[in-house]
């Protein structure tokens, strides 16, 4: 069956585990006790650039993507029945020349029946509602929010981290780095490495 475990996700509603095999370009489904169910071909141009995969309900997958010259978007929304791309989300404000990911940081979390996620160089927290990406919270930490005009002042950049460091020196926020969900609170770590909490209302 699969030859490489590149990533996986769990669909708790339908009770199966899905494994991404980048070598074969396939998604394999298994029951919770390891029994093979079925397999699907996946679009290599999308799935070869995935950092991690999240089931977000309503038959949708949210894919967190690498930042490099072959990937122009932070996320992709994919149909779980076909594993076909529905739309790309959140264009990267800066595209790195080398492959960079934020996959080691928890940027997608679940809480109170919702999904919350961040994008690079942004203080906005997003959610998925009715199959669409929507902003839900804006973190105000006393620094200026990065915008298009600010980014253009120092172009070109070799990487997204170079852009972040230059803008932080000018009094801009570098965006949200990590999210954690604990009970009914959402905790976030900003680019100044300060942790703050948000109470989540249903």
Segments predicted by a language model, with ranges:
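Asp-box/WD-like beta-propeller blade repeats and closely related beta-sheet repeat scaffolds
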Residues: 2-7, 20-74, 84-97
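Structural signature of eukaryotic scaffold interfaces centered on beta-propeller domains
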Residues: 6-13, 51-58, 100-119, 166-183
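Short, ordered coil/turn segments that flank beta-strands lining enzyme active or ligand-binding pockets
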Residues: 12-13, 23, 32-33, 80-81, ...
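Hydrophobic beta-strand positions that form the internal "hydrophobic ladder"
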Residues: 17, 61, 115, 186-187
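Structural motif
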Residues: 24-28, 69-77, 122-127, 194-202
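Flexible, glycine-rich surface segments
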Residues: 128, 145, 149-201
């Amino acid at each position: 069956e699969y030859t490489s475990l590149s990533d996986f996700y769990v669909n708790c509603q339908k009770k199966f585990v899905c494994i991404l095999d980048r070598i074969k370009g396939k998604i394999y489904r298994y029951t919770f006790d390891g029994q093979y169910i079925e397999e699907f071909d996946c679009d290599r141009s999308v799935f070869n650039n995935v950092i991690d995969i999240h089931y977000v309900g309503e038959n949708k997958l949210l894919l967190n993507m690498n930042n490099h010259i072959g990937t122009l978007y932070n996320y992709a929304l994919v149909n779980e029945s076909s594993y076909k791309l529905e739309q790309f989300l959140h264009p990267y404000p800066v595209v790195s020349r080398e492959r960079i990911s934020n996959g080691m940081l928890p940027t997608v979390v679940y809480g109170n029946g919702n999904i919350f996620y961040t994008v690079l160089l942004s203080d906005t927290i997003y959610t998925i509602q009715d199959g669409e990406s929507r902003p839900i919270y804006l973190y105000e930490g006393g620094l200026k929010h990065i915008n298009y005009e600010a980014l253009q002042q120092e172009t070109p950049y070799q990487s997204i981290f170079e852009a972040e460091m230059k803008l932080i020196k000018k009094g801009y926020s570098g965006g949200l780095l990590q999210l954690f969900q604990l009970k009914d609170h959402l905790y976030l770590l900003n680019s100044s490495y300060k942790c703050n909490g948000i109470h989540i209302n249903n």
